[in-house]
Amino acid sequence: MNLEKKIINIKAKIAIVGLGYVGLPLAYAFLEKKFQVIGIDLDKDKTIKLSKGINTLKHLKLKNLKKHIKEKKFKIENDFKKIKDVDVIILCVPTPLNKFREPDLSYIINSAKEISKFLK
């Protein structure tokens, strides 16, 4: 089955790299649409909390977070090894501005290097 059909039929496995203000709500939106999601974040404290169903973004209501984890629809990792099992990878990492108001792309570059180790 090609990727388009997997997405249409909700069979695509999604990886979200970065589970902060953008990544976690995006992962949750995919989960609510019945996709299987792997969330990757290098912050071990955050991944431990999320694995226990603890919402790390208090301003958001993620009422089904524990359910998605219990049903194994949402797997949380702090390394990139599981990336080889997904169909779609979405980067949601920071791009903070430096003193010259230029984006720091190091998070994107480092994530891409890690992802490249596990591409099919």
Q: What positions do the PLM features span?
A:
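Structural/interface elements that position substrates and couple domains in central-metabolism enzymes
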Residues: 1-120
